[in-house]
């Protein structure tokens, strides 16, 4: 199965700061998908097919990458972006998730 490694595990950002988190796959995948999860809620699909934003996701989010290296970027951090973000692949069975990047907001 394909192992997804997310980095960093935990990070913090101030309002307006650019944020980048990465997801590294142990083998090449065609696309990467990202989910956002806030405490006490179910994960929400956030970015799919590497770079497409799910409905309602703000344009400050961007996804990019190919093969084994993918990233999620927030061009200008907002307080409501604080959450845990998970990458996911289904190019190869079984479907696998990364262990998450927890993004905290600095005041």
Curated annotation (Swiss-Prot):
Region ranges (Complementarity-determining-3): 88-96
Location of region: Framework-4: 97-106
Keyword Disulfide bond recorded: yes
Record PROSITE patterns: IG_LIKE (PS50835)
UniProt-listed PANTHER family: IMMUNOGLOBULIN LIGHT CHAIN (PTHR23267)
Function: Anti-2-phenyl oxazolone (PHOX) Antibody.
Listed name of the protein: Ig kappa chain V-VI region NQ5-78.2.6
Source organism per UniProt: Mus musculus (Mouse)
